[in-house]
């Protein structure tokens, strides 16, 4: 198993970890009820996906 030959400095470690950003979810408007929803998912508000109701919402 490989072992580090030299200690990784704080600066080098932090530069590498600077790319570990969290991204906010992309949101689009539901074409049926106009609420915000995640694309390519069933709308939580009305249960529609791709122009048809796939989840029965009471």
Curated annotation (Swiss-Prot):
Keyword Cytoplasm attached: no
Single Gene Ontology MF annotation: structural constituent of ribosome
Entry keyword Ribosomal protein: yes
Keywords per UniProt: Ribonucleoprotein, Ribosomal protein
Pfam families: Ribosomal_L32p
A GO biological process held by the record: translation
GO cellular component: large ribosomal subunit
HAMAP family, per database record: Ribosomal_bL32 (MF_00340)
Family affiliation: Belongs to the bacterial ribosomal protein bL32 family.
Protein name in UniProt: Large ribosomal subunit protein bL32
Gene: rpmF
């Amino acid at each position: 198993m490989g072992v580090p030959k030299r200690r990784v400095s704080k600066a080098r470690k932090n530069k590498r970890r600077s790319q570990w950003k969290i991204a906010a979810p992309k949101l689009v408007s539901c074409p049926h009820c106009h609420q915000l929803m995640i694309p390519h998912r069933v709308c939580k508000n009305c249960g529609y996906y791709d122009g048809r109701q796939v989840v029965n919402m009471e």
